[in-house]
Amino acid sequence: MEKQRKEYEELKQKLKQALHEKKVQEQEWDQIQQEIFDKETEYLSGNASSKYGTIVKGFDGFGKHASQDSHHFQDQDRIFSLSSALFVKQQEGVQDEE
């Protein structure tokens, strides 16, 4: 009986440790996805070097004067963020709360 109790306590401790590690990994994953989202927003919003186009939208304005607002983009332009189904689901949850 004592041996089973000891084994139970060891397994219980391993489970606690595994759950803690899982939580840490999920937090890191969320942070990485948020960083991707932020960098993607920064890139799609544009700066002086991207006024003629981006990899995502193309470079139609390269040979022209880019007088139009090139800083406008839609969520469908987010090819990296949208590639993560979990991140999309989380973002939809955030929008529902607002």
Swiss-Prot record:
GO biological process, one term: DNA repair
Location in the cell: Nucleus
Entry keyword annotation includes Coiled coil: yes
Cited function: Component of the NuA4 histone acetyltransferase complex which is involved in transcriptional activation of selected genes principally by acetylation of nucleosomal histone H4 and H2A. The NuA4 complex is also involved in DNA repair.
Gene name per UniProt: EAF6
UniProt keyword terms in alphabetical order: Chromatin regulator, Coiled coil, DNA damage, DNA repair, Nucleus, Transcription, Transcription regulation
Quaternary structure annotation from Swiss-Prot or TrEMBL: Component of the NuA4 histone acetyltransferase complex.
A Pfam family: NuA4
Family listed: Belongs to the EAF6 family.
Protein name from the UniProt record: Chromatin modification-related protein EAF6
Top-rank taxon, per record: Eukaryota
InterPro entries (alphabetical): Eaf6
Coiled-coil intervals: 1-36
A GO term from the CC aspect: nucleus
